[in-house]
């Protein structure tokens, strides 16, 4: 039987990728706030 490269669930690989994407998202939000001078919620219209 061939072993699958991707396993479902809370595996070390899945948690590593989750952390990487979370860091990219966090840095992106900070970058947007610095460039525009406004928060993300204000930019998407949730705060007026």
UniProtKB/Swiss-Prot annotation:
GO CC entries: chloroplast
Localization annotation: Plastid, Chloroplast
Coiled coil: none
Gene3D superfamilies, sorted: Chlorophyll a/b binding protein domain (1.10.3460.10)
UniProt keyword terms in alphabetical order: Chlorophyll, Chloroplast, Chromophore, Plastid
Ligase recorded as keyword: no
Domain of life: Eukaryota
One Gene Ontology MF term: chlorophyll binding
Keyword DNA-binding: no
Function: Possible role in chlorophyll and/or carotenoid binding.
Family the UniProt entry places it in: Belongs to the ELIP/psbS family.
Stated name of the protein: Uncharacterized protein Ycf17
Organism per entry: Pyropia yezoensis
Lineage: Eukaryota, Rhodophyta, Bangiophyceae, Bangiales, Bangiaceae
